[in-house]
């Protein structure tokens, strides 16, 4: 769910997920999809593509369990869809951390109508 995703992003990046990524670029946040503006936005684009591959669960609502061991996210689910959902969220949180160096505040509240159409996943 959005709750676990937000928690993972906070743990990996140290940033407030809603404030820092809720409307970042063309792909971060609930709305929008478009050609990524930078590496951070690309993380969100790949994350949305990951969600598209899921079948049998709702990425925004379904809860899953994970643990934080030695600063590492460990997904712990028996349900295959919830396990994949957790892995999608883990991947974006790590990607956002790996691209903190190029995070650009000018894209924090980017207007989605200015986004160009993205390639298909």
Swiss-Prot record:
Pfam families: Phospholip_A2_1
Gene Ontology CC annotation, any one: extracellular region
Keywords: Disulfide bond, Myotoxin, Secreted, Toxin
Disulfide bond annotation, renumbered to this chain: 26-115, 28-44, 43-95, 49-121, 50-88, 57-81, 75-86
Tissue specificity as recorded in UniProt: Expressed by the venom gland.
Record-linked SMART domains: PA2c (SM00085)
Chain segments carrying region Important for membrane-damaging activities in eukaryotes and bacteria: 105-117
Subcellular location: Secreted
An MF annotation (GO) of this entry: phospholipid binding
Major location category of this protein: secreted
Coiled coil residues, start to end: none
GO biological process, one term: arachidonate secretion
Biological role: Snake venom phospholipase A2 (PLA2) homolog that lacks enzymatic activity. Shows myotoxic activity and edema-inducing activities in vivo. A model of myotoxic mechanism has been proposed: an apo Lys49-PLA2 is activated by the entrance of a hydrophobic molecule (e.g. fatty acid) at the hydrophobic channel of the protein leading to a reorientation of a monomer.
Subunit structure: Homodimer; non-covalently linked.
Similarity comment: Belongs to the phospholipase A2 family. Group II subfamily. K49 sub-subfamily.
Stated name of the protein: Basic phospholipase A2 homolog piratoxin-2
């Amino acid at each position: 769910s959005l709750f676990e995703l937000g928690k993972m992003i906070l743990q990996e990046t140290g940033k407030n997920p809603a404030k820092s990524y809720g409307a970042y670029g063309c792909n971060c946040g609930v709305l929008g999809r478009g050609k990524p503006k930078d590496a951070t936005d690309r993380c969100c684009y790949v994350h949305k593509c990951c969600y598209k591959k899921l079948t049998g669960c709702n990425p925004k609502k379904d809860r899953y369990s994970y643990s934080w061991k030695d600063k590492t996210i460990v997904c712990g689910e028996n349900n295959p869809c919830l396990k994949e959902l957790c892995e999608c969220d883990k991947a974006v949180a790590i990607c956002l951390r790996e691209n903190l160096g190029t995070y650009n505040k000018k894209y924090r509240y980017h207007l989605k109508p200015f986004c160009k159409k993205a390639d298909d996943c």
